[in-house]
């Protein structure tokens, strides 16, 4: 009744997987084309739970894919295009070999091409899904946009990545959705809030590239091919949400302001407009010009008594968010030629500030360094020869730290030639028991509106504190001597006295704490062996974290003391 008995490895998990070579033969594709197809369709290898069973008893290392994924790829239209491209290459080589140049031109004109629109719709059914998965796409496009025009990558791909990345930056500026920025060894990390989704991407520094040899650029190019299509769709939809023209165009007033005589010297005529957009110093034009409406107010409804606290907290957070968006409103910046212009211009404009630079540095300058309305001059030099009185000369780190602190920090710590404070990461959130550096504590106090003493004032008071400590030590020694003398006198003259008793007042909080500790101890005693083992593991981890935090605190204390000693030595020399 049961039918024929199946052989070993013909049922169960062994039939759910297929090796890479078998999948490739099933699709009739070469290995590079198979990899390319899997990247575009989002198909990835899987590690079976019982690898030996799936591998039919063998322990040889093999790559496995789900059989249902490979069956899904059989119906993909791009597979046919890959085969057509294979035939195209063969015909082109044959025409080259025969030196039939007319045939070469004709075959080139009929080069097979394909679109990835249907794959984008298939992988991202809703627009929010596409926005949520934009982190890697942004990082890859920003990386490719900085590549030199060498043989490693196609020039068209580099130009496309640059155009899409500039479009996205202009959207972030117009929507004021930038939230965090961090300078790391790898590059500059940005975090933005796009339609309620948090996106984090990294952009490389503007240094010359030395292409590594251990990187497969074909795989990277395939990912970039997919990501550029995705980013193009997303940019178009994002521009529509803000009523901006797409492809982006400069505002008519901004276009007049940005006109300069040396445009043809800086870039080709075909690239001038793109370079003006990439300068990020001008606003974009809208489909229907919107009038500024600053009187918009949030509707207020009768507060629910149960959720009154939650509503107040949300209202406070909304106000802080709006305040953060307009951090640099009313401030006018000028960037010296030695500072990272692209990053600073993007950040300053994202928070409502105005920015410009010397016209000889880059196209897109809106005013020069002699403008009397400039409030902040960003420089990265030890000293400035000629300074204008009515502006601050600051190092670039001030801009980044202000964004992360969500307020305008004191400028005294960022003057040219001053030793800069540490650049704290905004992506680190300390938990209970973690080590918090003093700079972070000072910053948290500033955000709450508290005033803490500066390091310089603390250093001046060190000598006074040491003198007070010496006086306290002398008083304690005198007290101990008196106690010893009283003890000796008491041993010689033992006078028995009867004193009235006192009623002991119980501390309720202490009693409650003792009861709580007793309950906890009894609960631990009643635990099962497994639960007790897990509890001990958790407690061990917490204690280890506290020990590490204490070690860091001691190291920091020793470092601060060494710095103070060094300062005193320098002061004595002078």
Curated annotation (Swiss-Prot):
GO terms for cellular component: nucleolus; nucleoplasm; PeBoW complex; preribosome, large subunit precursor. GO terms for biological process: maturation of 5.8S rRNA from tricistronic rRNA transcript (SSU-rRNA, 5.8S rRNA, LSU-rRNA); maturation of LSU-rRNA from tricistronic rRNA transcript (SSU-rRNA, 5.8S rRNA, LSU-rRNA); regulation of cell cycle. The keyword Zinc does not apply. Signal peptide: none annotated. GO terms for molecular function: ribonucleoprotein complex binding; RNA binding. Component of the PeBoW complex, which is required for maturation of 28S and 5.8S ribosomal RNAs and formation of the 60S ribosome. Required for neural crest migration and eye development. This is Pescadillo homolog. It comes from Xenopus laevis (African clawed frog).
């Amino acid at each position: 009744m049961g039918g024929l008995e199946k052989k070993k490895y013909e049922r169960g998990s062994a039939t759910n997987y297929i090796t890479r070579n078998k999948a490739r033969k099933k699709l009739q594709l070469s290995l590079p084309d198979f990899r390319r197809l899997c990247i575009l369709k989002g198909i990835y290898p899987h590690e079976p739970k019982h690898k030996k069973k799936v591998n039919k008893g063998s322990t040889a290392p093999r790559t496995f894919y789900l059989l249902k994924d490979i069956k899904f790829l059989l119906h993909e239209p791009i597979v046919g295009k890959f085969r057509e491209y294979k035939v195209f290459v063969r015909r082109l080589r044959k025409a080259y070999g025969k030196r039939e140049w007319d045939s070469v031109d004709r075959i080139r004109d009929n080069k097979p091409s394909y679109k990835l629109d249907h794959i984008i719709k298939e992988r991202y059914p809703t627009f929010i899904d596409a926005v949520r998965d934009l982190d890697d796409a942004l990082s890859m496009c920003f990386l490719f946009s900085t590549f030199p025009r060498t043989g490693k990558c196609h020039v068209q791909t580099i130009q496309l990545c640059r155009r899409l990345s500039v479009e996205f930056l202009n959207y972030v500026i117009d929507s004021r959705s930038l939230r965090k920025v961090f300078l790391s060894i790898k590059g500059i990390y940005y975090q933005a809030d796009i339609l309620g989704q948090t996106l984090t991407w990294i952009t490389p520094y503007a240094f010359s590239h030395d292409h590594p040899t251990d990187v497969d650029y074909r795989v990277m190019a395939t990912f970039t091919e997919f990501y550029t299509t995705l980013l193009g769709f997303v940019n178009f939809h994002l521009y529509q949400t803000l009523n901006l023209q797409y492809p982006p165009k400069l505002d008519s007033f901004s276009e007049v302001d940005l006109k300069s005589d040396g445009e043809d010297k800086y870039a080709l005529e075909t690239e001038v407009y793109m370079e003006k957009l990439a300068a990020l110093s001008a606003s974009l034009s809208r489909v229907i010009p919107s009038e500024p409406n600053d009187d918009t107010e949030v509707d207020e409804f009768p507060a629910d008594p149960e959720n009154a606290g939650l509503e107040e907290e949300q209202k406070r957070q909304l106000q802080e968010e709006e305040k953060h968006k307009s951090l640099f409103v009313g401030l006018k910046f000028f960037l010296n030629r030695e500072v990272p212009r692209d990053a600073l211009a993007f950040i300053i404009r994202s928070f409502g500030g105005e920015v410009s630079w010397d016209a000889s540095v880059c196209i897109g300058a809106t005013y020069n360094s002699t403008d009397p309305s400039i409030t902040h001059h960003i420089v990265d030099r030890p000293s400035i020869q000629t300074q204008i009185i009515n502006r601050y000369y600051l190092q670039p780190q001030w801009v980044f730290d202000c964004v992360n602190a969500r307020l305008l920090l004191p400028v005294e710590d960022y003057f040219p030639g001053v030793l800069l404070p540490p650049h704290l990461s905004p992506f680190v959130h300390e938990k209970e028991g973690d080590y918090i550096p003093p700079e972070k504590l000072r910053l948290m106090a500033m955000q709450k509106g508290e005033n803490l003493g500066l390091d310089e004032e603390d250093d001046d008071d060190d000598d006074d504190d040491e003198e007070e400590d010496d006086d306290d030590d002398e008083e304690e020694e005198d007290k101990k001597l008196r106690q010893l003398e009283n003890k000796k006198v008491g041993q010689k003259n033992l006078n028995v006295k009867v004193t009235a008793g006192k009623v002991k007042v119980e501390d309720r909080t202490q009693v409650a704490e003792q009861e709580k500790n007793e309950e906890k101890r009894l609960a631990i005693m009643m635990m099962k062996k497994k639960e007790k083992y897990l509890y001990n593991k958790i407690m061990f981890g917490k204690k280890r974290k506290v020990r590490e935090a204490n070690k860091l605190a001691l190291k920091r204390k020793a470092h601060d003391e060494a710095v103070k000693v060094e300062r005193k030595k320098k002061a004595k020399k002078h």
